[in-house]
Amino acid sequence: MAEDLINSFMTGPDEQGRFGIFGGRFVSETLMPLILDLEAEYERAKDDASFWAEMDDLWKHYVGRPSPLYFAPRLTEELGGAKIYLKREELNHTGSHKINNVLGQILLARRMGKTRIIAETGAGQHGVATATVCARFGLKCIVYMGAHDVERQAPNVFRMRLLGAEVVPVTSGRGTLKDAMNDALRDWVTNVRDTFYCIGTVAGPHPYPAMVRDFQCIIGRETRRQLAEQEGEGRLPDSVVAAIGGGSNAMGLFHPFLDEPSVRIIGVEAGGKGVDERMQHCASLTGGRPGVLHGNRTYLLQDGEGQILEGHSISAGLDYPGIGPEHAWLKEQGRAEYVSVTDDEALAAFQTLCRLEGIIPALEPSHALAHVVKIAPDLPRDHIMVVNLSGRGDKDIFTVAKHLGVDIRT
């Protein structure tokens, strides 16, 4: 078993930013000094009590943490099996988990004297969080967003502009998250002096995957404490479930439980129109293979010649042809399991949570909920399952209405 081979699943990455064969730093000579400076500053910040004191204060008074751990009674009753808890990250300021990480990176940018912040965004949640924190600290903010995502996430585009950010539509490729990240990296190369790149997920060159994970681990740490308060001292969840695009919300929930062998860890990818040879999905762990993209080695959707494929998902935040390298490593080690659900299954789960709990989830966590709907009925009633509700669904109502054949624009 994997547990017999490794003393801890929580010690990575190594000094080169690698999780086994995954991760690393595959960047241009122009960017390497910036990457090394960022790593050095983060290592200093990790040991600086004042840095974490400021983070804790902002998490509490600005973000509104801790986010609730909510027992979902009607969903549990409807499914008739596992006891389901929702980690309510959608109740954070800006409506998702993204601000947990953005706060940390912007504080690092200020320590480094950077005055111009760039970011990529898919669903718009990371862009909104970045624009929000830049407004809080008076920093210039430029957000790259695929033109296709600009269209399907119009409410978040308006929010970013209200917050003072410049939103740059990216028309290359299919106009989605991969293309936005490409253009953000090009910007960074040409504006190295004053610019900080705030990456929104556990991907990219080292130290980003580890750094973003560390900032998001507040999710799992709170979950451990809150579940013990509600279910009894020492009680751990039997399973934790989260949707995965790049994988930051999932890693934030998973990481504090990696060394607890009794906790089943399940990541849910975007199966789109089905994981088959058409590649109309974004399930890189389920239907991809290892390669290099955006500065790290990981599982990717690619053709026989190694060209990156576009993929598809109804969810803009999961519409990415790769995955964070730590997830790739956990898959290889057998510590976490990764599955996929289709667009239609996610839409059904979206409606189920609205109807049963009065909570409108984003389409991203609706994928995790869809898998819960599949497996919870077959689990015993004392099985505790925690689902990361990583974002709220206000941004998705137009997309959902369109797929349901409802016109809400008139």
From Swiss-Prot:
**Top-rank taxon:** Bacteria
What InterPro entries does its record include? Trp_synth_b_CS, Trp_synth_beta, Trp_synth_beta/beta-like, TrpB-like_PALP, TrpB-like_PALP_sf
**What is the uppermost EC class here?**
lyase
Q: Write the record's keywords in alphabetical order, separated by commas.
A: Amino-acid biosynthesis, Aromatic amino acid biosynthesis, Lyase, Pyridoxal phosphate, Tryptophan biosynthesis
Question: Which PROSITE patterns does this chain map to?
Answer: TRP_SYNTHASE_BETA
Cofactor(s) for this UniProt protein: pyridoxal 5'-phosphate
Please verify whether the record's keywords include Zinc: no
What does the entry list under GO cellular component?
cytoplasm
Q: In which pathway does it act?
A: Amino-acid biosynthesis; L-tryptophan biosynthesis; L-tryptophan from chorismate: step 5/5
- PANTHER family tied to this protein: TRYPTOPHAN SYNTHASE (PTHR48077:SF3), TRYPTOPHAN SYNTHASE-RELATED (PTHR48077)
Oligomeric and partner information? Tetramer of two alpha and two beta chains.
Q: Indicate what this protein is called per its UniProt record.
A: Tryptophan synthase beta chain
This protein's species is Paracoccus denitrificans (strain Pd 1222)
